[in-house]
Amino acid sequence: GDVLIDLVDIGAGTRGLDYIQCIPGGVPGEKHAPNLFTHVDRFLFVNLDGKRFIKEDARRDVLRDAMLDQPKAIAWTIVDADGFEQLKNSKGPENEVALKTGTLYYADSIEDLAKKIGVPANNLKEAVDTYNKGC
């Protein structure tokens, strides 16, 4: 931010600064953020109600707006065990740290995961079932 302002002050041009692009993953106050959204065909987003609210392959600006519209602007990224395994080569270290620090959760069932992340199990199950039918 500060360097950009200094560059503009000395004449640097800018473009596209009237919007932001964002993707999920950051946990406020945490140094190690889990990364589960590399492979769009392996994850889904749910809100604090456990409901899927967007197609995960949407453009970043559409994702941003949809996430910011959710309760408390929070969304969970849900990935199955196979998807998590696929990420080990590229994102394994970050995800392992996130598991240890409690910013990433592992569960043996949808009901267990719902309990860990504090969402209604029936909504999460419906979101996962609907997602799986579309794959």
Please tell me what each predicted stretch does.
Residues K115, V119-C135:
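C-terminal catalytic domains of large/alpha subunits in multi-subunit enzymes
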